[in-house]
Structures are given as structure tokens and as C-alpha cells.
Amino acid sequence: MYQRTATQLARKPASKQGETEMNNSIQDLKQVEDYYGTTRRFGDSDATIYEIWEQGGAFNDSITPSTYSQEYRSHLGLKLKSLTEEGAIIFSIGCGNGFVEGDLVQAKRRVLAIDFNDEAVALSRKKGVDAYTADFFELEPGALAGVKSIYADGLLGHLFHPELELKPTFEKLKELNLESGTTLVFSNDSPRDPEALFAAHDKVDGFWFISRDYLRDALTEAGFKIEESYYFPYTRPISGLRNRTLCVALVP
């Protein structure tokens, strides 16, 4: 039986101070680290965003749908289970708290995961996920051999570049030599303006909202085959009803 661990799949960067030139041009990793690692007042104590999310809570309008919306969490779990069989390897990029990933472990999927933030990795590992700290752009060609499905919830909003858009991200995916038939499951909040293809977050620097139509067309342009493209509605504590872009694609 094919066996591979997240340690083999994901190489931990030697330093978070010295990232590759390409990655620096796409994502401000220090900005990401500060946003998630800074403690904020929550109830009677201080907590990081991850600690707040772990309790199913919100910091102002900041939530993760996989803990704040049980319907969303259930939908994503069912979607990924429908795309894989028991024992299949699912690879989560930017696993965060790892709630959907933990549910998939309980459903007898083998879940490997990476996240740039050590705290996220620790929380995911507590849920049985084989998670390690790593940078997506540092993965080596062939690192995801044997993976049947790739899942990224909210990651694309961090990787979107105002000029390069998602081209470097999808080029990196293709460099990993994914097996034909591998499914890609991407999820990200869409812009509030239904006419906008993408839009910068007005509260979180460096994060972008991505529409269903944009993501579908960008994946198609990158050479992937679209299986599903739709919106999943859910509510946030302040902004209210929001649409979550969901797109399922196949590696040809």
C-alpha cells in the first residue's frame, strides 16, 4: 500500500525571514503571520484568531466558516467524501484549524496538510491530521504523488496578487506533477459586489475576495477541467449573508 507522510510531502522552510523571491512577490508572509498570531481581547481573556475560531467564535466579522457555520462544514465534508474513497489521501493546503480535515480523518480518509502558521498546524494535529509547517511554494515537484484530492479553504484569498492574480499559484500546482484525475476543491469568500470578479478585503490587508465566475475561468485558463462552480450562502456576525465561492476541478 502506498504510504507517504506530510514530513516527506512538505519541506519546512529554514527561516520565515528569508522566503523565495517569487513568494515575496505574491504574499506578505510576515503580514499573514502577524494577523493570525496577534492576540486580541475575547471575552475575559486574550486570544489569537485561531484560538477564537477554535471555540466557534468571531472577532468582529472575522470567522472561519468551517467552525462558525455547521452547514458549511458539513457541506465541505460531504463534498470531499463524495470525491474520495475510504483510505484515499487528501492534501489540505492552508489547513488552519483543521475542522473539516479532522472530520475527514474520522471518515477514514488519510489527510495530509500544511500551513505556514505553527499554531494552525498544532491545532490540526490534535484532530488527527498529519499536518506540518510548510510553505506551498516550497513544495517540490512530485511531492503530492498518490494524493487523490487537494483541498484549499480560504487559501486563494491570501495568494491572490493584484497584477499576477492566481497565475503563479496555478502554475505551482502544475509543477507538482499531479496525477490525472486528481480533484481540486477550492473555497473562498466572494466580493460583496455581485458584478465584481475579485476585490480587496476592506479590513484585512493582503486578502482578496474571489468570485465564482473568476475562479472558474482562471482554472480553465490554467488547463484544469471544471466539474462544479457555485456559491454556498452563509452568514457572518456583522456583514450578514455572504456567498462562499466553491469550485471543483479535475487535473486532466
Curated annotation (Swiss-Prot):
Cystine pairings recorded for this chain: none
Region Disordered, residue ranges: 1-23
The name this protein goes by in its record: Tabtoxin biosynthesis enzyme
InterPro entries (UniProt xref): SAM-dependent_MTases_sf (IPR029063)
Function according to Swiss-Prot or TrEMBL: May play a role in tabtoxin biosynthesis.
Phylogenetic lineage: Bacteria, Pseudomonadati, Pseudomonadota, Gammaproteobacteria, Pseudomonadales
